[in-house]
C-alpha cells in the first residue's frame, strides 16, 4: 500500500484571543486516489477543517499534527503547503485587482515547480482548459475574479485546479450558488482533475458534483470532531433521506441504534447498505 498523502492526528483548532475551540480531537487519513466527502450541519467545523489544513492564519492549531506527503506542516504557512501540492477552493473566491488570471496562473505554476514556464505550451493548455470549462478566452486577460459572475469565479477556481495540478484538492462548496449547467461543468472539471495520484476532500450541498466520482469515504462532523465515517453509500443514504437537510440543518446529526437523526427527522441508517 502507498504511504498516506495526508494524516491529521488528534487535531485541536482554536480561534481568537479567547481560544474558542472549533475542532477537537479530529483524526483523518487520506491516501492517493481517494475522494472524501465532509458532511454536517452549519457550524460543525467543515470549513474550519479545510482552512486549518491549508494554514489559514486566522486559526491556531493548539494540539495535534498535520502531516502532508510525510512532512509535518502543522505550523507551516499556506504558501509552503501550496508549494507542496495542497490547494483550497474557496466558498467565495476573492477578487484580486492588478493581476490577470493568466499571470496569476503562470506565476503560481512557476512558484510550485521552481522551473520557468514555457509560455507557448502554457497558453495552449490554458486555452484548452478554458474551452472545456466554457470560459471565454478573454477572461485570461482580466484581473483575477474582478467583475466575474459567481459562476465564472467558481469556474476560475476549477481552472486553477486543472492548471496547477495539486496533489490534494480541498473543495469547499465549489458548487454553491451555481445553476444546473454550471454545476455540471464544475463536476466535469473535478473529474478531469482527479486521478490515482491525487486526492479530493469535498464539502457540498449538492450530490450532482459527486456524479462520476467514486466516493471512498464520507465523514460526518459534529461537536468539533468526526463522529461518523462510512463509504459512498452513506453519502447516498443521507442525500436520499434528507436532501440538503444534513448540510443546511442547524441541528446535530446523531447515530443511535441504526438510525440517523437530524433535528426532528429520523431515518434508518440501514439504507446505506
Predicted features by range, described:
Residues 217, 225-247:
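Conserved beta-strand-loop-alpha-helix hinge in the C-terminal portion
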Residues 65-81, 145:
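ABC ATPase NBD Q-loop/coupling interface
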Residues 183-196:
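Helical segment within the ABC ATPase nucleotide-binding domain
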Residues 173-174:
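Walker B catalytic motif
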Residues 39-41:
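The feature captures the beta-strand-to-loop junction immediately N-terminal to the Walker
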Residues 92, 98-113, 125:
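Q-loop/switch helix immediately C-terminal to the Walker
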Residues 161-162:
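ABC ATPase C-loop
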Residues 2-8, 12-25, 31, 37, ...:
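A short, flexible loop at the N-terminus of ABC-type nucleotide-binding domains that lies
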